[in-house]
Design a protein with these regions (language model features):
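An acidic/histidine-cluster motif and surrounding catalytic segment
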Residues: 1-106, 110-230
Length: 230
């Protein structure tokens, strides 16, 4: 997903890493949704009338009655950037449905470190979403996440690294495989509970079948600015 010059350069690095590792993917570059194109993205997804329901500041933090989860706002200078990021991911999910194919979603900061052959993973997976990314430096409590995941080789459930009512999912959402069936479940959940940051929505409490894999296939490129905290 690309939305500026820095993202374009980073995307070239992703493509180069795909070639270097011999990863079996055919890249499709999807222009990212921006604050200026949020309305267009919502129209494409038929999500008109679906509100953002995740806390925007500390005054809204607390228990979400629909899900029973304890939600904490993300520090974001421009909330529209966070919404745009979510819509970009939702458009990727819709693309999986339209193609009727399992796809790999890559944010602009992803980088392959090992050869990925998707069929090697999909023959064993249970649910339809697999996190591919090294958690270290990419998620909350990343060392604990890594310690638990690296103790077992292969596909495994998302580890618990926090209290049971705190959303816990993939190690950041910069790289994950998703099936059309899972994509439909995610979009249906958005319609049911409203829009959340994609990494909060994709949590083990709402989708117990989420999986991660070790050894990892991707890491994040260093030094890139976040498009969601600005």
């Amino acid at each position: 997903m690309v939305n500026n010059h820095e993202s374009t350069v980073a995307t070239r690095m992703i493509i180069e890493s795909i070639k270097k590792t011999g990863t079996k993917l055919e890249p499709i570059i999807l222009p990212a949704t921006t604050p200026q194109t949020i309305g267009e993205g919502i129209d494409q997804l038929n999500m008109n009338g679906v509100a953002w329901t995740y806390p925007l500041d500390e005054h809204q933090d607390g228990l979400d009655l629909k899900t029973g989860l304890r939600l904490t706002h993300y520090k974001t200078e421009n909330h529209s950037n966070r919404v745009a990021c979510m819509i970009s991911h939702m458009r990727c999910w819709q693309k999986s449905i339209e193609l009727n194919q399992t796809i790999v979603v890559l944010e602009h900061d992803a980088l392959f470190t090992d050869t990925l052959c998707p069929e090697d993973l999909t023959s064993e997976w249970k649910g339809g979403i697999i996190g591919l990314n090294d958690p270290r430096g990419a998620t909350r409590r990343s060392q604990e996440f890594h310690r638990k995941v690296s103790s077992y080789v292969g596909l495994q459930p998302v580890p618990s690294v926090d209290d049971w009512d705190v959303p816990q999912g993939l190690a950041g959402n910069s790289a994950y495989m998703i099936s059309p069936k899972a994509a439909k479940k995610l979009l249906n959940k958005v319609k049911a509970i409203g829009m959340w940051p994609n990494d909060a929505l994709m949590c083990k409490q709402l989708f117990p079948w989420l999986e991660v894999v070790y050894p990892y296939y991707t890491t994040i490129q260093k030094g890139l600015k976040s498009t969601t905290t600005q």
